[in-house]
Each structure stands twice: as structure tokens, then as C-alpha cells.
Amino acid sequence: EVDAGYASNYTCRGIVASHALAEGDSVIPAGVNLNYKLCDANSIVASASYTTLTSGHHLMGDRDISFHNETNFNLGWQNKDGLLKNLSTTLGWNLIHGGLLGNFAKYDHAHSVTQEFYLNLNYDLTQNWFAGVTTSYAFQGMTGWWFQPYVGYKAALCPVTDIVVTAGMSATSSYFGAAFEQANGAQAWWVKAELPVKLGVKNLSLVPFVSFNWAGCGALKVNKGLDKGDKPYKNFGVVAGASLVYSF
């Protein structure tokens, strides 16, 4: 699967960056997702993505600290129905260069790379409802834990159009450095709606989306006490955009 698109704001695990954080707002993401079947139950999954920030590329306007575009590499093993019927389990490794997490790593550790191991559990509750959680442990750059539980609903509106609605949150434990205000607690809450539309070309879809994002207590601690123009995160943000997806 190959995709490319546009989003009105840069987001990281539900956190919406302010204009001040990266000297800009919108992003242009592109990526490729691969799934190699080993057998009916097991697969090797891999992905690579690059997110271009249409911004000044400086962290909080500091000319000495660049805010790099985000590059993400992912490699994992996926099992379906092995532990429990309707349960998909993915265990893998993730490398992030740039973006919010990579740039925080550079700020504290003189480089822009964060690496982590992750475990995703996704359970199909019914034909339409699903729920899951992704747990990540970062071991290079920024270290600590991320937790991202979610619940969602998917259905066909007509033969060429589906709808997917997801609600979720992200939280950290001892991340960003134990002494940092944002180290622990909820970082973001969100509700996202997607409307995949099959186009006339075989395997080609357009996926418009909109999400409503609220900063969690961890992110709010960073904003607290700062002037409005200097807050790194949006207390509330609406992010809209679309992606063109080709499946093969």
C-alpha cells in the first residue's frame, strides 16, 4: 500500500503542535506499508513514511535548533487468531528521526533519533466494532513508555464509500526525561472520522478525514504559565486533510 496526502496540522500521537512549536502548521505525509504473509496466521509487516512540515523548521523559533521533518521506519511480526479468535497481535520495532519525538531527543541527547519496541493488540468485538492498545518502550533517544488505547467503528455507507470513526488517547510514563513536566500522564485525547472512497481506478482510494484533539494533563502542564503565542501544543485542535491510497 502506498499513500500520500495533506493534513492541516502536525500531530504526534494525538498531540497537536502549535504554530509556534515548528514555525508552521500543515504537513505533507507520504508512506508505504508492506505485508508479507508467512502463512494464514503470521505475517511480516513493514512500513516507511516521511512527513514534510511546511514550516520554518526551527524549534520554538530558536535558530540554533532545527525542527527536522519526520521519518519513520517500522518492522514487525503479526499474528492473527493465534492467542484469541478475532485478536491481531503485532510485535515490532520502530525508528523515528525528526518530528516531535526525534527533535526532543536531539534537544536532550545531541541527536534526532528515537528507537522503540512496541506491542499492538487489536480485537474485533463485532463485525463493525473494534478496540485495541499499542504499548511502546523507547530505548534510544527519548526513553520511557507510551500507551495508546483506542476503540472504533467501521461500516460501509454504500458500495464505494466506508466510514471509520476512532476514539483514543495517549499517555506516557517516565518519558521526555523523568524531571520534565510532561514525563507522566495523559498526553492527548481524540476522536477521528475517516471516509474512504473508492475511485474509478482499481485499488485507488481517497481518504478524507477530520479529527478533534484535546491536550492531556501532561501536555497541558507544559503550556501552563506560557504566553499564548509561546505554547508548544494546542489545548484543542481540529485537524483535517486527505490521503490518496493505492493498494497492491
Question: Where are each of the predicted segments found?
Answer:
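Membrane-embedded beta-strands of outer-membrane beta-barrel proteins
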Residues: 30-32, 46, 73-75, 117-119, ...
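Repeated loop/turn-to-beta-strand initiation elements of outer-membrane beta-barrel proteins
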Residues: 2, 39-46, 82-89, 127-133, ...
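Hydrophobic alpha-helical segments and helix pairs
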Residues: 72-124
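Transmembrane beta-barrel strands of outer-membrane/channel proteins
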Residues: 2-8, 46-52, 77, 91-97, ...
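Outer-membrane beta-barrel translocator domains and adjoining extracellular loop/strand segments
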Residues: 12-20, 56-66, 100-112, 134-135, ...
